[in-house]
Amino acid sequence: MTQLTLYEEAMCCSTGVCGPDPDDELVEVSAALDQLENEFDVDVSRANMQHNIEQFLETQQIADLVEEHGPSILPITVVNDEIVARETYLSYDELASTFEDSPDPQEA
């Protein structure tokens, strides 16, 4: 199974899609991640600095990047322990192409 982790800046809730006027980009990201889980053998997790700081600290590569660049480096998208994007959210098509190009860790 492919592992996707999205490290994000501090937000009011786990997805940032809350309140009366959620950010359109975060709505699109949430929909893209849901679609990926339905179409691919992928386990998606999201870590935001306010609610999941332990995930940032436990992943040395992410902790080092945030320490060096500050939170402006976020979001960071990691697929199977490899950073595939930083400082931007990927679209559904961009995310899907990373799964098509990346071998399943169980098959490698």
UniProtKB/Swiss-Prot annotation:
Gene Ontology biological-process entries: negative regulation of DNA-templated transcription; response to arsenic-containing substance
Protein induction: By arsenite and antimonite.
Highest taxon listed in the record's lineage: Archaea
Tagged with keyword Lipid metabolism: no
GO molecular function, one term: DNA binding
Knockout-associated phenotype: Deletion of the arsADRC operon results in increased sensitivity to arsenite and antimonite but not arsenate.
InterPro entries tied to this protein: Arsenical-R_ArsD
Repressor listed as a keyword: yes
Swiss-Prot/TrEMBL keywords: Arsenical resistance, DNA-binding, Plasmid, Repressor, Transcription, Transcription regulation
Function statement: Trans-acting repressor of the arsADRC operon.
Record protein name field: Putative arsenical resistance operon repressor ArsD
Organism: Halobacterium salinarum (strain ATCC 700922 / JCM 11081 / NRC-1) (Halobacterium halobium)
